[in-house]
From Swiss-Prot:
Species name: Homo sapiens
Result when mutating residue 392 to L: Abolishes proteolytic cleavage by MBTPS2
Lumenal side: 396-519
MBTPS2 recognition, short sequence motif: residues: 392-395
Swiss-Prot/TrEMBL site (Cleavage) positions: 426-427
Keywords: Activator, Developmental protein, DNA-binding, Endoplasmic reticulum, Glycoprotein, Host-virus interaction, Isopeptide bond, Membrane, Nucleus, Osteogenesis imperfecta, Signal-anchor, Transcription, Transcription regulation, Transmembrane, Transmembrane helix, Ubl conjugation, Unfolded protein response
Cytoplasmic side: 1-374
Membrane-crossing residue ranges in chain numbering: 375-395
Subunit structure of this chain's protein: Interacts with SMAD4, the interaction takes place upon TGFB1 induction and SMAD4 acts as a CREB3L1 coactivator to induce the expression of genes involved in assembly of collagen extracellular matrix.
Biased segments, Low complexity type: 210-223
Listed name of the protein: Cyclic AMP-responsive element-binding protein 3-like protein 1
Glycyl lysine isopeptide (Lys-Gly) (interchain with G-Cter in SUMO2) cross-link, chain position(s): 184
GO biological process, one term: positive regulation of transcription by RNA polymerase II
Span list, region Required for transcriptional activation: 1-60
Length: 519
C-alpha cells in the first residue's frame, strides 16, 4: 500500500493556512519526509508549531464541524462501519477466552477524571511540550532501565499510573543530546473538550490466539479513520471503535521519534499472537503490519461482542413477549370457558322457558281453533239454508205443489156431488191390460149420476151414450188439473178410442163390519 501512494511532499507539513489536509497522509510519508533541525530548541519550536497546526486543523475543518459521522452514533450501538462489516453474533456475556488476567473495572476509575485515556479514543491531537528534566541526568546506563520499564509495561496495567509516570523515557545516544526530553500531556486543555465518565470505559476480554479477524475492516490504515471534532460534547457508547480505549489513537502512530503508547488490549493481543511489542517510533514495516492485524482483530472482537449483546437483548425481549402472550392466552382461554358455560346455562333456561310457554299457550289455542271451526260450520250451514230458501222452484215442483193445493178442493167438489151414505173405493183388475185413455188413468172419474153401477153387468153391456159421457167427463177433469203447457192431445199420444181389456168394477156395500177384497 505504501508503494502505491505517492510520496508526501515536504511543503505540506507546514501549510500556510490553518487547515491541514490529512487525507493524503500515510505513515511512511510522515515518518520519512519529516525534516527537523539539529538543534533541540529549534526542534522544540517546530514541534510546538506543528502540533498547534495539527490540533487546530480539527477545529477549523468545516466538514468535521458541520457533520461528523462519529457524532451520530447512539450509546448502545457500534460504529456504522463495524456494524455493516460484522453481522455475526455470539453470546453477549461471553467470558474471556484467554487465560490471561482480564482488565478490572476498578483500575479505570482512578485516572478517568484526568482524561488520560480520553486521548486514545477521541482521535484528537495533543499538544506536546519539550521540557528539560533536571531529575533525570544524562547517563548511558539509563538505557537498560528504560528497556526494563518498557518490558514491565507489557504485563502491568497502565490504567493506574499517572499521565507523567505512564510515559517511558526513550533511549537516545549521549552524543545527540545532553538531556532527555520529556513529553508532557496537558489534560486540562483536553478535558475542557473531552469529558468521559468512568461508566463510559469498557472492559473487553483479551483476544485469543486462535482468533482471526476479517480483512475487510482492517484494510484501512488506522490513520485513514476520520477524526472527530471535540467541540461538541461526546455522549457516545464506549463499545464503539472511536470511543474505545482499547485502540491507540492513529496520530500517536505517526510520530518520528519518542515512545509508543499502546493499550493493554493491543499489548495482550500482540503477546498472544507472538509479535514483539513496539515501544518507540518510528515503526518498522513488520511492526506496522502486526499492529494493523492486531487492531483489526480488536475491532472485530468489539463488533462481535456488540452483536452478541444486541442479540441477547433481542432474545430476552422475545422471551418476555412470549411470556406475556402466554399469560394473555391462558386468561383468554379461561374467559372462553366461562363464556361457554354461561352459554350452556342460557340455552337450558331457554329450553325450559319454551316448554313452559308451549304448555300454557297450546290449550287455549286448541280450544279457540275448535270454537272457530264450529262457528264456521254453523255459518256455512246457515248460509246453505238461506240460499236454499232463495232458490226458485222448478216448474215441475211448482205444478206439483199446485196440484197438491188444488187436489183437495177438486176432491171436495167431487165428493160433495156424491150422495152415497158410505165411501166406496175404485180399483181395477191387474190383468185387464192397457188403459183406454192415458189421461183418464191419472184420475179415475165416476159417472155423474152416481157411484153405483149395475150389478153383474160388464162394461160392454152399458149403453153407448154412457161411454161417451164418461169420456167427456174425464177429458174435462184432465184439462182442469193439468197445465196448459201440455198439448191437448196428450203427452203419450194415446187415442181416447184406444181399446183395452175390459175392466171390472165392483160395487160393494160398505158396512161397519165389512172388509174389502180385491179380485
Amino acid at each position: 500500500m505504501d508503494a502505491v501512494l505517492e510520496p508526501f511532499p515536504a511543503d505540506r507539513l507546514f501549510p500556510g493556512s490553518s487547515f491541514l489536509d490529512l487525507g493524503d497522509l500515510n505513515e511512511s510519508d510522515f515518518l520519512n519526509n519529516a525534516h527537523f533541525p539539529e538543534h533541540l530548541d529549534h526542534f522544540t519550536e517546530n514541534m510546538e508549531d506543528f502540533s498547534n497546526d495539527l490540533f487546530s486543523s480539527f477545529f477549523d475543518d468545516p466538514v468535521l464541524d458541520e457533520k461528523s459521522p462519529l457524532l451520530d452514533m447512539e450509546l448502545d450501538s457500534p460504529t456504522p462501519g463495524i456494524q455493516a462489516e460484522h453481522s455475526y453474533s455470539l453470546s453477549g456475556d461471553s467470558a474471556p477466552q484467554s487465560p490471561l488476567v482480564p482488565i478490572k473495572m476498578e483500575d479505570t476509575t482512578q485516572d478517568a477524571e484526568h482524561g488520560a485515556w480520553a486521548l486514545g479514543h477521541k482521535l484528537c491531537s495533543i499538544m506536546v511540550k519539550q521540557e528539560q528534566s533536571p531529575e533525570l541526568p544524562v547517563d548511558p546506563l539509563a538505557a537498560p532501565s528504560a528497556m526494563a520499564a518498557a518490558a514491565a509495561m507489557a504485563t502491568t496495567p497502565l490504567l493506574g499510573l499517572s499521565p507523567l509516570s505512564r510515559l517511558p523515557i526513550p533511549h537516545q545516544a549521549p552524543g545527540e543530546m545532553t538531556q532527555l526530553p520529556v513529553i508532557k500531556a496537558e489534560p486540562l486543555e483536553v478535558n475542557q473538550f473531552l469529558k468521559v465518565t468512568p461508566e463510559d470505559l469498557v472492559q473487553m476480554p483479551p483476544t485469543p490466539p486462535s482468533s482471526h479477524g476479517s480483512d475487510s475492516d482492517g484494510s484501512q490504515s488506522p490513520r485513514s479513520l476520520p477524526p472527530s471534532s471535540p467541540v461538541r460534547p461526546m455522549a457516545r457508547s464506549s463499545t464503539a471503535i472511536s470511543t474505545s480505549p482499547l485502540l491507540t489513537a492513529p496520530h500517536k502512530l505517526q510520530g518520528t521519534s519518542g515512545p509508543l503508547l499502546l493499550t493493554e488490549e493491543e499489548k495482550r493481543t500482540l503477546i498472544a499472537e507472538g509479535y514483539p511489542i513496539p515501544t518507540k517510533l518510528p515503526l518498522t514495516k513488520a511492526e506496522e503490519k502486526a499492529l494493523k492485524r492486531v487492531r483489526r482483530k480488536i475491532k472485530n472482537k468489539i463488533s462481535a461482542q456488540e452483536s452478541r449483546r444486541k442479540k441477547k437483548e433481542y432474545v430476552e425481549c422475545l422471551e418476555k413477549k412470549v411470556e406475556t402472550f402466554t399469560s394473555e392466552n391462558n386468561e383468554l382461554w379461561k374467559k372462553v370457558e366461562t363464556l361457554e358455560n354461561a352459554n350452556r346455562t342460557l340455552l337450558q333456561q331457554l329450553q325450559k322457558l319454551q316448554t313452559l310457554v308451549t304448555n300454557k299457550i297450546s290449550r287455549p289455542y286448541k280450544m279457540a281453533a275448535t270454537q272457530t271451526g264450529t262457528c264456521l260450520m254453523v255459518a256455512a250451514l246457515c248460509f246453505v239454508l238461506v240460499l236454499g230458501s232463495l232458490v226458485p222452484c222448478l216448474p215441475e215442483f211448482s205444478s206439483g205443489s199446485q196440484t197438491v193445493k188444488e187436489d183437495p178442493l177438486a176432491a171436495d167438489g167431487v165428493y160433495t156431488a156424491s150422495q152415497m151414505p158410505s165411501r166406496s173405493l175404485l180399483f181395477y183388475d191387474d190383468g185387464a191390460g192397457l188403459w183406454e185413455d192415458g189421461r183418464s188413468t191419472l184420475l179415475p172419474m165416476e159417472p155423474p149420476d152416481g157411484w153405483e153401477i149395475n150389478p153383474g153387468g160388464p162394461a160392454e153391456q152399458r149403453p153407448r151414450d154412457h161411454l161417451q159421457h164418461d169420456h167427456l167427463d174425464s177429458t174435462h177433469e184432465t184439462t182442469k188439473y193439468l197445465s196448459e203447457a201440455w198439448p191437448k192431445d196428450g203427452g203419450n199420444g194415446t187415442s181416447p178410442d184406444f181399446s183395452h181389456s175390459k175392466e171390472w168394477f165392483h160395487d160393494r156395500d160398505l158396512g161397519p163390519n165389512t172388509t174389502i177384497k180385491l179380485s
